[in-house]
């Protein structure tokens, strides 16, 4: 039940700040920042800069003690590991997907952060389709409907015999 409450707060009140430091400088009691939320027991809580501080961990995982790159750096690093001939297309066609990509402001922030990392001549385009919350599921559904998908199936026996490498052999 508590997870559902947190998920509901996340979906209704949280957003990604375009400029985290500037947003933090906004007075904590600013009426534009504070929002009320009624808990199931009727208690009303006020949520202030937590609305954007929590999603900021996507860009600054160190906030929660994680030693990993932010989502923008991971995206940039992934593009840079690809063949140089396709990087331009990847920069111009970065598609957000999954429930966490539904935060208001995430596409603009990704645009800003990747633009800062990429070569200045590169055209950056972040695509945030409205149905992105379910696009991973939709993609899996499309894959499963392909006539060629059955040849990618892996039985437990095959996996036990070959380990994770069977995925690369059958699917790539």
From Swiss-Prot:
Record's function text: Actins are highly conserved proteins that are involved in various types of cell motility and are ubiquitously expressed in all eukaryotic cells.
Enzyme Commission (EC) number: 3.6.4.-
Keywords (A to Z) from UniProt: ATP-binding, Cytoplasm, Cytoskeleton, Hydrolase, Muscle protein, Nucleotide-binding
Similarity comment: Belongs to the actin family.
Organism of derivation: Lytechinus pictus
Top-level taxon in the UniProt lineage: Eukaryota
Recorded catalytic activity of this chain's protein: ATP + H2O = ADP + phosphate + H(+)
GO molecular function list: ATP binding; hydrolase activity
Subcellular location, record wording: Cytoplasm, Cytoskeleton
Protein's name in the database: Actin, muscle
Pfam families to which the protein is assigned, alphabetical: Actin
Cellular-component GO terms for this entry: cytoplasm; cytoskeleton
């Amino acid at each position: 039940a508590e997870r559902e409450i947190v998920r509901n707060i996340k979906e209704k009140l949280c957003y990604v700040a375009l400029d985290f430091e500037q947003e933090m400088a906004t007075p904590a009691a600013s009426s534009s920042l504070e929002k009320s939320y009624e808990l199931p027991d009727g208690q009303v809580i006020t949520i202030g800069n937590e609305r954007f501080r929590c999603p900021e961990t996507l860009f600054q995982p160190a906030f929660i003690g994680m030693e990993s790159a932010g989502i923008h750096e991971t995206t940039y690093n992934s593009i840079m590991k690809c063949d140089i001939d396709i990087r331009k297309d990847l920069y111009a066609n970065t598609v957000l997907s999954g429930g966490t990509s539904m935060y208001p402001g995430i596409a603009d922030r990704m645009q800003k952060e990747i633009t800062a990392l990429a070569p200045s001549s590169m055209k950056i385009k972040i695509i945030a389709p409205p149905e992105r919350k379910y696009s991973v599921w939709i993609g899996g559904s499309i894959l499963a409907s392909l006539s060629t998908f059955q040849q990618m199936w892996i039985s437990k026996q095959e996996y036990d015999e070959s380990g994770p490498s069977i995925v690369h052999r059958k699917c790539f």
